[in-house]
């Protein structure tokens, strides 16, 4: 193959958008058109076709798929390495786009896996309601708290209906009418109860495994305890408890109100309150992100012809294989449609959780609940009759039941709508608050490792931070939640789907199909010859699995075992002469296959220390021809693994990885960015609203009215984003075409917000009441946390200040925006090298054929944890594949202007 220096000079052009993917010679295009009647050569997701009925190469050519068994497998501690030998026979062409790795194995998702909200056990029980039980009193005394519903006469031998006390009387049986025990005498009754030696736990969430096929749960002898009503003068038993010890467990709940150890077995232990464990879906990442190991340190994949042994795969640490694949799919198809074969279910979040549209609750009509009898309270009465001018007792044909209720029917009121909204806010927002806004309840010991599921479960959010009255009437995201990853949430529908594909149990077997994503070979037409194909697969559960809570799955007991990896591939169903013609054409270097990486960008990560607001970066001098611009965002350091290692010991996190899956959510933290070349040229000139060399993203104080769309984004930045994403701007604003306005686009994710706050400077009587002293719903809610037992008494609320009505306080307007998923973009092109003052007289040229250094300064909002500036330098990234002879494959990677491995060299 000719060396790059012998090839014709590449001509650079400005490519609008990222749609240019493959460049084919005119001859190859003509060939594709000639064969398009039965096969679409240029379509990656190829349509199914029927193979020719005659004149085919061999019977294998007509098979839909072939299985390749590995010739070498190496199951290491951190990776599973596998090697295949691809034999492509004469007059056949292997379609690399059809290949996938077929992987089987077993998965232990660990004890932190909980694929549902709430509890599966006694979910209807009150949170602090007790089981039927005996409990300790003073000294050796035993106390009793129980319900006895099973009616039947009691003798010294127990109840006659109870023939096997290992499971009878069963706790789910009792009278079926409200009449029994109210109007009609229930008589003697029995039930089951836990012995005092069984630990105290609330009924909500409690479970004991059966010990016999009839459902009995006793782990030892069942003992009878007899009781009589204290007011009865006879010496007969009225109630009977069959007491037993059971193996009491709480599979999916924990205590949020716990008494001290010396009170657990006493009466105070009956009032402990349970809460469900937090839901935690665990599944493979979208499109199996992180499973295949892309690396440049010797563990990278190999595709080499056995004749030449030249590896066609040259991966770089600054290449964006996973992110590029995500954005490519978004350009091709609707990402909101899930597809199980490739585990394709994009990470998402509930819009109502990220931005709370708090329009109050529609509780104009009160909600009542009534007693089962439908009347009451009932009073025992005596029948009377008239005797002359007086009354006397009527004993004629009068039965023993004479009950009458005075006044209206007894009822209790509950505000269902307010409770539902309050519960929604607690489960979906408050529980996901940063840890600094949570506390550990008394008598509960939290684990030292904050990345564990057990730690996340016991921490409770403080009251009044997220509630129905906070920002009421506004569409606003809680400020403290803006920098919390919204994709690490149980309402991430894509993750929930991927978790459910594996089933609902902790232990599961999996059988998955993993596509090849590397841009240089995922569309390759492999010509006849014998090739070595090798790849490594990670076994680090934090990298290959994703969880809702982002807990450290290594510590929490998850593990994976890969049992086998096979490769499936397809040959083109072509006749002899067609296949040989295609091969002959592709052997010619003028018909080399050229593939452009979809993202075509070199990425760099620059650390931003905690509480830092300015970050300068420098790029050494280079020729900027072919450069297309910058894309950038911000990601958290703890959510970003070291990709060069198969196992990053510092990556103690399993939530979404924005660096790989495009779940960006910190774009709103940028304030401005300046771009300076080492020349006198002001780039991009003063034809914009603001200062040359500087892009102002948002303004907190906007005296000149530069902000746009009821937010604090500047008009200039809005214009730049509309231009960069849609080429909309100078010709007036309009909505972009649907094929451009996809999941990751700017306009779809731009969310302006506005609210009013008390003007503390102009409201003389304003009192800054701290959260702990604010009360609203006192007596009906907890002062500590929503989940704690209610406390207090009814009283006028002291928070928040009214922003409406005749007593509305003075206010100021606050504005902001969010723009998740989207990469900020600044376009650049060799065509725009002369963007000085855009006049015929004053243009200064930033010559494209000379080298210039670049200095950029980013101003960002301070965050209290280390973050990373993620910059994509949009380059011209093309692989040109040449297969001159049988079993020989050569690839030239062209990467301008960053031809070396990363953007700093």
Swiss-Prot record:
InterPro entries: Adenovirus_Pll_hexon_C, Adenovirus_Pll_hexon_N, Adenovirus_Pll_hexon_sub2, Adenovirus_Pll_hexon_sub3, ADV_hexon, VP_dsDNA_II
Annotated site, Involved in interaction with pre-protein VI, chain positions: 729
Example of a GO MF term: structural molecule activity
Chain positions with Phosphotyrosine modification: 893
Modified residues (N-acetylalanine): 2
Keyword presence, Phosphoprotein: yes
UniProt keyword list: Acetylation, Capsid protein, Cytoplasmic inwards viral transport, Host nucleus, Host-virus interaction, Late protein, Microtubular inwards viral transport, Phosphoprotein, T=25 icosahedral capsid protein, Virion, Virus entry into host cell
GO CC annotations on file: host cell; host cell nucleus; T=25 icosahedral viral capsid
Localization of this protein: Virion; Host nucleus
Keyword Transferase: no
Organism domain of life: Viruses
Induction: Expressed in the late phase of the viral replicative cycle.
GO terms of biological process kind: microtubule-dependent intracellular transport of viral material towards nucleus; symbiont entry into host cell
Subunit structure: Homotrimer. Interacts with the capsid vertex protein; this interaction binds the peripentonal hexons to the neighboring penton base. Interacts with the hexon-linking protein; this interaction tethers the hexons surrounding the penton to those situated in the central plate of the facet. Interacts with the hexon-interlacing protein; this interaction lashes the hexons together. Interacts with host dyneins DYNC1LI1 and DYNC1I2; this interaction might be involved in intracellular microtubule-dependent transport of incoming viral capsid.
HAMAP family: ADV_CAPSH
Note from the entry: All late proteins expressed from the major late promoter are produced by alternative splicing and alternative polyadenylation of the same gene giving rise to non-overlapping ORFs. A leader sequence is present in the N-terminus of all these mRNAs and is recognized by the viral shutoff protein to provide expression although conventional translation via ribosome scanning from the cap has been shut off in the host cell.
Protein family membership: Belongs to the adenoviridae hexon protein family.
Role according to the record: Major capsid protein that self-associates to form 240 hexon trimers, each in the shape of a hexagon, building most of the pseudo T=25 capsid. Assembled into trimeric units with the help of the chaperone shutoff protein. Transported by pre-protein VI to the nucleus where it associates with other structural proteins to form an empty capsid. Might be involved, through its interaction with host dyneins, in the intracellular microtubule-dependent transport of incoming viral capsid to the nucleus.
Name the UniProt record assigns to this protein: Hexon protein
Native organism: Canine adenovirus serotype 1 (strain RI261)
Lineage, highest ranks first: Viruses, Varidnaviria, Bamfordvirae, Preplasmiviricota, Tectiliviricetes
Underlying gene: L3
